[in-house]
């Protein structure tokens, strides 16, 4: 498949395993230089090794993107490592399961920080340069629960729906 992105540069958050790594793998296969991050150095190194073994160009950064400050810092480091970021893939783990009745109000700010605010910060760090260059893409890994909420995932449903609404609004700007 040729997506027309060969030679572009991508920052892929939380990409030492799972969906993030799958995104990084596809981008690398398409000839994109990838900066990926994860919290565990051994997994970051293994992910980079796997991409390089498949012929990809990858840089690994040990980083935790589970908050606004940390998300923006990852993109800043990726920008420095790659000389810019053309494609941003926002991704992070999910907050704990729970229902409305079982979830304390105090659990909401960390969930929003993890999923919504980290995405906002990553976009704040990457999108202005994309606009200046006249080209850029933001891909957010959220959940199908933004369309149909899951009964025991109130924190995730709330944060990911907010993330989707934020990105739809950003796209119109």
Predicted regions and their residues:
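The beta1-alpha1 cofactor-binding region of Rossmann-like NAD(H)/NADP(H)-dependent oxidoreductases
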Residues: 41, 62-74, 105
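Alpha-helical segment proximal to the catalytic Tyr-Lys
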Residues: 128, 172-173
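Conserved glycine-rich cofactor-binding loop
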Residues: 9, 14-18
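Conserved glycine-rich Rossmann-like NAD(P)H-binding loop of the short-chain dehydrogenase/reductase
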Residues: 32-46
């Amino acid at each position: 498949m040729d997506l027309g992105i060969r030679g572009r540069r991508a920052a892929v958050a939380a990409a030492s395993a799972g969906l993030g790594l799958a995104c990084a793998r596809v981008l690398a296969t398409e000839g994109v230089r990838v900066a990926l991050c994860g919290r565990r150095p051994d997994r970051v190194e293994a992910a980079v090794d796997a991409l390089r073994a498949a012929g990809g160009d990858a840089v690994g950064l040990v980083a935790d993107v589970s908050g606004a400050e940390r998300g923006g810092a990852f993109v800043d480091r990726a920008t420095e490592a790659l000389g810019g970021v053309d494609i941003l893939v926002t991704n992070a783990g999910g907050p704990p399961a729970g229902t409305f009745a079982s979830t304390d109000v105090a659990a909401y700010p960390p969930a929003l920080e993890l999923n919504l605010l980290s995405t906002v910060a990553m976009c704040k760090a990457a999108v202005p340069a994309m606009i200046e260059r006249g080209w850029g893409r933001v891909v957010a890994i959220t959940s199908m629960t933004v369309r149909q909420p899951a009964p025991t995932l109130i924190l995730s449903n709330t944060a990911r729906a907010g993330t989707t609404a934020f990105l739809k609004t950003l796209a119109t700007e």
